[in-house]
Curated annotation (Swiss-Prot):
Glycans are attached at N10. It is a single-pass type II membrane protein. One of its GO terms (biological process) is medium-chain fatty acid catabolic process. Residues 123-364 form the AB hydrolase-1 domain. Its main location: membrane. Ubiquitously expressed. This is Protein ABHD1. Its EC number is 3.1.1.-. It is found in: Membrane. The active site is at S203 (charge relay system), D329 (charge relay system), H358 (charge relay system). Keywords: Glycoprotein, Hydrolase, Membrane, Serine esterase, Signal-anchor, Transmembrane, Transmembrane helix. It is an enzyme of class 3 (hydrolase). GO terms for molecular function: acetylesterase activity; monoacylglycerol lipase activity.
Length: 405
């Protein structure tokens, strides 16, 4: 009798399974609705806040991360796997640097040259990819495509060696060294002196932008900046990336990519560093200890990380910059964000979403159709380029000695 009750023909198991499945789906949707869907937190001084909220509605709207992959690590991974690759054609510029190196700038070609505005005054979006990234990365292509659709020029600054070109010197790139970025900005401003320039730095590129702003202050050559998933504190970043799961998913693959770049340029790099020792690195910290700190003249990795962390330099920034980060970013923990400093800064605004991961920010059921970061660029660039008068007189909020510097 019991066997007949449990038999498949009875339908009990099927009904029970259907009921449990429906309950699981209901609980999942309930959790998503109650805990995942949140408005981002916008942290800024009152003047900058008053500019951003009406001009960038995305900063006050609920973020709807993709229903079936809202966890931070999944967002980070699926962004690479799922997003489409827009067709972008580039024309490359090769710049020579004072130390004998070379830089590759990729200028995106306008889709319809007959509709081009005056290039001498057309706004320019300068994009800086993440570590080992280039103009061919999916996230870069989407941002470039957005800039082109909005009627701006778009140019990508590729870090040395990241487009496959050979290094001319032993130096590749370093988060604390902004000399190459200064060279690029000066080149663009010399070529288009009347065109407003907005820098968009992603991850490692965002660190470069923040450090450049802090070092150059008003002479940064930019009207504003947007940084996406940048890391404010190098010590907290490496600590987070060295946890077991993050190490497996992110730290080890990134370190392998860095080692490949060194291996490709062995002949020029081995003059300064022990290549074989560098290639044994299994973490970014080990790579920075064995290569980056040596190549760029730092005593050790600790000294380098202190110089590379923008967290302690926020008070030196004198150009408006909007920073986007997710609270579940495996590269940049919330504890590393300069929230208190941003609350008192006239120039720095932090936009913190509850979900999004690292350069993830996938949204909607079909995340390859729309992207949160592209929408943010659209609204922020429009506000900066088309309504510069709407920006408050931020310099007036500074002490008199800073206004005159």
């Amino acid at each position: 009798m019991l066997s007949s009750f449990l038999s498949p023909q009875n339908g009990t198991w099927a009904d029970t399974f259907s009921l449990l499945l429906a309950l699981a789906v209901a609980l999942y949707l309930g959790y998503y609705w109650a805990c995942v869907l949140q408005r981002p937190r916008l942290v800024a001084g009152p003047q900058f806040l008053a500019f951003l909220e009406p001009h960038c509605s995305i900063t006050t709207e609920t973020f709807y991360p993709t229903l079936w992959c809202f966890e931070g690590r999944l967002q980070s991974i699926f962004q690479v796997l799922l997003q489409s690759q827009p067709l972008v054609l580039y024309q490359s510029d090769i710049l020579q640097t004072p130390d004998g190196g070379q830089l590759l700038l990729d200028w995106a070609k306008q889709p319809d040259s007959s509709q081009d505005p005056d290039p001498t005054t057309q706004p320019i979006v300068l994009l800086l990819p993440g570590i080992t990234g280039s103009s061919q990365e999916t996230y870069v292509l989407h941002l470039v495509n957005q800039a082109l659709r909005d009627g701006y020029q778009a140019v990508v600054f590729n870090n040395r060696g990241c487009r496959g070109e050979e290094l001319r010197t032993h130096r590749a790139f370093c988060a604390s060294n902004t000399e190459d970025l200064e060279t690029v900005v000066n080149h663009i401003k010399h070529r288009y002196p009347q065109a407003p320039l907005l820098a968009v730095g992603i991850s490692f590129g965002g660190i470069l932008v923040l450090n450049h702003l802090a070092q150059a202050r008003q002479a940064a050559g930019l009207v504003a900046a947007l940084t996406l998933s940048a890391c404010w504190d190098s010590f907290e970043t490496t600590r987070s990336l060295e946890t077991p799961l993050n190490s497996l998913l992110f730290n080890q693959p990134l370190t392998a990519g860095l080692c490949q770049l060194v291996e490709r340029n062995r002949k020029v790099i081995e003059k300064v560093v022990d290549i074989d020792f560098v290639l044994q690195a299994r973490t970014i910290r080990q790579f920075d200890e064995r290569y980056t700190s040596v190549a760029f003249g730092y005593q050790d990795c600790v000294t380098y990380y202190k110089a590379a962390s923008p967290r302690t330099k926020i008070d030196a920034i004198r150009i408006p910059v909007l920073y986007l980060s997710a609270a579940d970013d495996p590269f940049s923990p919330v504890c590393a964000l300069p929230i208190q400093a941003a609350q008192h800064s006239p120039y720095v605004a932090l936009l913190i979403t509850a979900r999004g991961g690292h350069i993830g920010f996938l949204e909607g059921l079909l995340p390859w159709q729309h992207w949160y970061m592209s929408r943010l660029l659209h609204q922020y660039a429009k506000a900066i380029f088309q309504d510069p008068e709407g920006l408050p007189d931020l310099r007036a909020l500074l002490p008199s000695e800073d206004r005159n510097s």
